[in-house]
Amino acid sequence: MKVFKISHLVKSEDLNHHGTLFAGRTAEWLVEAGFVTAAAEHGRPQDVLCVNVHGFTFKRPVEKGDILTIYGRIVKTGTTSMMIHVKAMCEIAVGQNVEGFITFVCVEQDTKKKRPHNIVLDETTDPEELELRERALHVQ
């Protein structure tokens, strides 16, 4: 599936009491990237709602002045739901900093009843994507 990316400059107002990127701000950015991925693939942002943040694994801190790029891609679909894998990586201090899975659903605007999104996972031979799809099957 297509990979979407968003970058953020880590500024003073994004920091915690340790002087590194606040986990709450990171979570906000990860959910935003997940939403962008789901909405862009679906084509109707007004139909897309976040229903579950399955947890994020923080692997290393992010410093002020770094550029954090968040990548999102759909790794699992149901009839009305789609699970997005998001990962954040620093552009300056290279390495993966945080990752996780988020589920979004599509709903009717007026009734808020779930509606099919008609997204089908494409065929892939990419080892990373295959591994993410396998992991997504076991996410609770």
Which residues fall in each region the model found?
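Hydrophobic beta-strand-centered segment that forms part of the acyl-chain substrate-binding groove
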Residues: L21, F35-Y71, V75-M83, G95-F101
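HotDog/MaoC-like acyl-thioester-processing domains
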Residues: K64, V75-Q140
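Hot-dog-fold acyl-thioester-processing enzymes
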Residues: M1-C50, E108-Q140
